[in-house]
Amino acid sequence: MNSDLPASKPDSSNESMTIERIQGTDGIRGPVCRLEDSSSSNPLAALLNEGVMTEEFFELYTYAYCQELLEADFASALDLVVIGWDPRDLSGRFNEAAVRGIRKAGLTAVVVDILPTPAVSLYQLHVGAACAFVLTASHNPADQNGIKIFLGHSNLKLFPEDDKRLTSRCLSIDYQELRNAPLLGELRNDQQAARKLFLDFMADQNNHWLSDHNLAGITIIVDVANGAFSPIIAELLKNVAADIVITNADPAQGINLRSGVADLEGVDYISAKEIDEGVFSAYETLRQMLSKGRDQQDRLRNSSDLVLGFVFDGDGDRCFLLCYDPFQDGILVLGGDVLAFFQASYLQQKHNWSQ
C-alpha cells in the first residue's frame, strides 16, 4: 500500500513551495483528514508539511485543473465535467468539496456517485465531457483518498509534464480567495444514467467473452473489496450462467479491508495453512475458495472444472485471478501481467492471428 504524497516541506506559504510535482504514477493519493484536524492554515500547507490531504485540497485540485482546461481552450464555461468516486468517503465531505471546485471554476459538475473507475470514464466519453475526476485511493486503506483525472474525448491520463503544470497552478492559487468564490457552474446528477450505460455496455456480447457453454462446471468467487463495484456487481452478473458467489460488497465493512487485491501484491501462491490458521485466516474470499475447492477436490483433479476468484481493487480498475489448486490444496494468484498474456493468447487463437 503506497502513498503518492510528497515529502514534507518546512514552510507553509505558497510562495516558498517549490515542489515540482505532487502526483504519483496515477493521480494523487494519500492520507486524508479534515482541515480543522490539521495544524496547517491552508490545504497546501497540510499537504506539504503534514503529508495529508484535507477536503479543501480536493476543492483546490479540481478547481485548478478545470482552470487549466479553460485557459487551454479545452473547455468553455458550463461545459460538462464528470465526477464519481469509490465509497471510502463516508461523510461525503471530500466528494462535495471536489464538486465545489468544478463549479467554482465555472464548469458543470456531472455527478455519477459511486461507480467503478471504468464506468466513470465510459460515461465521460458518452456525454463528451471535458474531463472526468475519480476520487479514490485505489487499493490503499480507507483512511486514504485521492484523485484520478481522465482527459476529455481521449480518456487518457495526465502525462508527467501535465502533472507539473497542475502542481504549479495549485501552488499559485490563493486558497482564501477560492474559499469565498461563488459557485458559477451548474450541478447535474447522472448517477442512474451512468449506471445504466455501464451495465448495458457490459451486457453487450461485443464487449465480453462470456457464453453459457464456456462456464459449465466453473465456480466463481467475485471479491469487490467493499469498493466501487459494490452497488452494481449483483446486477452486472445476474445473467451469468455459472455458480457465482459475491464477497466483500458492503462498503460499511471497510474498503480494501481483508479483501480485494491490496494484500495480494507480490503473492504468487497461498497455502491452505495460511488460510486455515495463518495470515489470511480472516479473508472471506480465500476461505470460500478453499471450502468450495475441497468440496469438489476429487472432481477437480479429474476434469477441466475450476474454482476461480476474481479479486478487484477499491475503485474497480484492477483485477487479480485466483485459481484453486486441487492437487496441493492451495490457491494460485495471477496478477495483471499474466491476465494480459491470457487475454492476448485468447484473441490470437480466436482471430487466427499469426503474430
Identify the meaning behind each predicted range.
Residues 149-152, 320-324:
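Short beta-strand-to-turn element immediately C-terminal to the catalytic PLP-Schiff-base lysine
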Residues 28-30, 35, 88, 116, ...:
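Short, glycine-/Ser/Thr-/acidic-enriched flexible segments
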Residues 23, 52-60, 93, 97, ...:
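Conserved active-site and cofactor/substrate-binding residues in soluble primary-metabolism enzymes
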Residues 71-144, 235-321:
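N-terminal small/polar loop signature for handling phosphorylated ligands or for N-terminal nucleophile
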Residues 2-98, 104-105, 185-220, 228:
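An N-terminal, well-structured beta->alpha segment
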Residues 84, 109-111, 220-223, 355:
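Short catalytic-loop micro-motif centered on adjacent basic/acidic residues
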Residues 112-114, 168-198, 325-355:
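Proline/glycine-rich low-complexity loops and linkers
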Residues 9-15, 31, 143-303:
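Gly/Ser/Thr-enriched, mixed-charge loops and adjacent short helices
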